[in-house]
């Protein structure tokens, strides 16, 4: 295990999102099954925490940007700052939708089409953000997710308002199309990992990378698909499973996504105005972490070294012997011990 390599590519933004979604996905089925009787405003607490950190990070980053004009010329600082502003705009629209959902569930006074209105606006904004992101080589997971699901948002809102009376299996047709594409991606990674395993011209590091990617995609997509199928059957009345058991596959997918954030490069350096990698920022604030971060463990390598030391022990080192009169240093070789020659006195004639 190499902690330095583990945290060097850590993406704190995605880790925060997946952690908040995991906690929310635990509280929501507990509330739906009646295990807890909290208000939905409290159930959505992880979502409020997520949005609060986004707004706080953007505010601090904007303040650092405004007070230090010299920072704007550092590499791609301008591009990253614009990407942060786009992300904040999308998060604000999502926050409006989540507030309207809580208000609709608690009071039930307005139509679901009005509740989904922020999502109808976020989709074209996400399309524009995707175009801008492709031009500047930016990460686009959230933007792509919001842009491709516009039809799904419309179907769900119409079904909740009973404008259409389709079964939920039909309502989620856009989602099935998206999941079919993700299944093709999983199949692609599986095939490539098998080809790399059978190839003799590929180094072991590349084989491990492709196998790891295939396993990650399988543990993300397959449980997610199982969760969606169980949820649709529960909404249509084909099964009476508890919501807790239905959400278990989703927890597995989110935990896998959290694990992948430790090996994913990226992340905007302008959140909270840190302007550097999150790992370097933590090491500057907490210097004692460097002692752990500079340690690497390789048990297999240590075992091989122990075997080599056991098979070929090092010859003992013998201290050098010094002559008192001649002041000559005699260093003995690591072979057989040979005594020095006897002292010879030469008498000079008068």
From Swiss-Prot:
<comment type="similarity">
    <text>Belongs to the TMEM185 family.</text>
</comment>
<keyword id="KW-0812">Transmembrane</keyword>
<feature type="transmembrane region" description="Helical">
    <location>
        <begin position="81"/>
        <end position="101"/>
    </location>
</feature>
<protein>
    <recommendedName>
        <fullName>Transmembrane protein 185B</fullName>
    </recommendedName>
</protein>
<dbReference type="Pfam" id="PF10269">
    <property type="entry name" value="Tmemb_185A"/>
</dbReference>
<keyword id="KW-0472">Membrane</keyword>
<feature type="transmembrane region" description="Helical">
    <location>
        <begin position="111"/>
        <end position="131"/>
    </location>
</feature>
<feature type="transmembrane region" description="Helical">
    <location>
        <begin position="240"/>
        <end position="260"/>
    </location>
</feature>
<feature type="transmembrane region" description="Helical">
    <location>
        <begin position="16"/>
        <end position="36"/>
    </location>
</feature>
<feature type="transmembrane region" description="Helical">
    <location>
        <begin position="168"/>
        <end position="188"/>
    </location>
</feature>
<dbReference type="InterPro" id="IPR019396">
    <property type="entry name" value="TM_Fragile-X-F-assoc"/>
</dbReference>
<dbReference type="GO" id="GO:0016020">
    <property type="term" value="C:membrane"/>
</dbReference>
<keyword id="KW-1133">Transmembrane helix</keyword>
<feature type="transmembrane region" description="Helical">
    <location>
        <begin position="211"/>
        <end position="231"/>
    </location>
</feature>
<feature type="transmembrane region" description="Helical">
    <location>
        <begin position="41"/>
        <end position="61"/>
    </location>
</feature>
């Amino acid at each position: 295990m190499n902690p330095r390599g583990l945290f060097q590519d850590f993406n704190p933004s995605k880790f925060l999102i997946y952690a908040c979604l995991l906690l929310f996905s635990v509280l929501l089925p507990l509330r739906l099954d009646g295990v807890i009787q909290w208000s939905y405003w409290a159930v959505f607490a992880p979502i409020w925490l997520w949005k609060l950190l986004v707004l706080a990070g953007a505010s601090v980053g904007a303040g650092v940007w405004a007070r230090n004009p010299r920072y704007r010329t550092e590499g791609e600082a301008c591009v990253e700052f614009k990407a942060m502003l786009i992300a904040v705009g999308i998060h604000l629209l999502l926050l409006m939708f989540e507030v309207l959902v809580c208000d609709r569930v608690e009071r039930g006074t307005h139509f679901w089409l009005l509740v989904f209105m922020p999502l109808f606006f976020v989709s074209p904004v996400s399309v524009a953000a995707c175009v801008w992101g492709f031009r500047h080589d930016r990460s686009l997971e959230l933007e792509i997710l919001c842009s491709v699901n516009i039809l799904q948002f419309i179907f769900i809102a119409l079904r909740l308002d009973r404008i259409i009376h389709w079964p939920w299996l039909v309502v989620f047709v856009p989602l099935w199309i998206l999941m079919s594409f993700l299944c093709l991606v999983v199949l692609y990674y599986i095939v490539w990992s098998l080809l790399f395993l059978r190839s003799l011209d590929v180094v072991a590091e590349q084989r491990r990378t492709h196998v790891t990617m295939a396993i990650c995609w399988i543990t993300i997509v397959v449980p997610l698909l199982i969760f969606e199928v169980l949820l649709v059957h529960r909404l249509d009345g084909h099964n009476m499973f508890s919501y807790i058991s239905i959400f278990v596959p989703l927890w597995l997918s989110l935990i896998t996504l959290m694990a992948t954030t430790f090996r994913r490069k990226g992340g905007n350096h302008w959140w909270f105005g840190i302007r550097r990698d999150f790992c370097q920022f933590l090491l500057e604030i907490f210097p004692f972490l460097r002692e752990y971060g500079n340690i690497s463990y390789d048990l297999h390598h240590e075992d091989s070294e122990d075997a080599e030391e056991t098979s070929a022990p090092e010859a003992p080192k013998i201290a050098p012997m010094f002559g008192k009169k001649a002041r000559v240093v005699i260093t003995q070789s690591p072979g057989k011990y040979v005594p020095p020659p006897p002292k010879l006195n030469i008498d000079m004639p008068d």
